[in-house]
């Protein structure tokens, strides 16, 4: 079956292609009475949309969302919420030369083998254009989570070889890179300018954090919260790796270093990333995403055509030299969708559970 829906109680279904007339989403399971407006959704869409700086694709899409159903007089009704974003700046002719060729490291080859045909215009369904609907749906989840005291936000923690230390959340929304260190922005800009001159691309690392999450979210064994987050975050285009907490750094740690010891005042560390045994611990939930460099570059690359003949591919069109630059709001959206789904699932099963043990924060 097609994998176009995520969630159990709070579900998000998307449809649409990069060069189709529109993108759509159906969001189901949102409790009634939640105050929601177009501005709530548009804020995150504007953070993600293309053409916002010289360091991203110059495709000009306003990404103005329309709410078709499920909201009446500014509040959710409890019925399915229909969302629509119209595509307005397609240039399909840019792709006519490669309609019978497979771009290296793209989904062209695998979509062709799976379905027997493919929409070659901008990648069709495999394009990251689809993630606009995830961001719109995620904005609804964020709004609901905020009523429960939960905040989800992210930042870029590495661009290519440049590591970006966390300094302040205030900086994240003040630059095109979502950098938490304002002093790094000139270096990032210079690196991206040189990358464009080299006609190349680069990967990135995004960190996303959820604060205020209560203990208890997650459904062992197969729907562990960390497993669900990894699933959701890995579904984002170009993501090739996900870490929870210390992640792969845990390999080099000893148990005395890695274990998050507890005191009456709180946890002494958070190597687990806020999840123990697949269940949220009450600490901040921390995930890191590795995004590959896009292979949509003008440097020629070797490939084959649909008949298996060797060819050289040069990708035209408008592309992000670093897809990670616009990935922060997408990662936030997917984490918010997972957390809302699990909060509703936890409430359904365990609403009557009362525990006298205090909820610990992190020192």
Curated annotation (Swiss-Prot):
GO terms for cellular component: cytosol. Its EC number is 4.2.3.5. InterPro entries: Chorismate_synth (IPR000453), Chorismate_synth_AroC_sf (IPR035904), Chorismate_synthase_CS (IPR020541). CDD domains: Chorismate_synthase. Pathway: Metabolic intermediate biosynthesis; chorismate biosynthesis; chorismate from D-erythrose 4-phosphate and phosphoenolpyruvate: step 7/7. The lineage of its organism: Bacteria, Pseudomonadati, Pseudomonadota, Gammaproteobacteria, Pseudomonadales. Homotetramer. Its cofactor is FMNH2. It catalyses: 5-O-(1-carboxyvinyl)-3-phosphoshikimate = chorismate + phosphate. FMN binds at residues 125-127, 237-238, 277, 292-296, 318. Belongs to the chorismate synthase family. This is Chorismate synthase. This reaction introduces a second double bond into the aromatic ring system. One of its GO terms (molecular function) is chorismate synthase activity. NADP(+) binds at residues 48, 54. Keywords: Amino-acid biosynthesis, Aromatic amino acid biosynthesis, FAD, Flavoprotein, FMN, Lyase, NADP. Pfam families: Chorismate_synt. Reduced FMN (FMNH(2)). GO terms for biological process: amino acid biosynthetic process; aromatic amino acid family biosynthetic process; chorismate biosynthetic process.
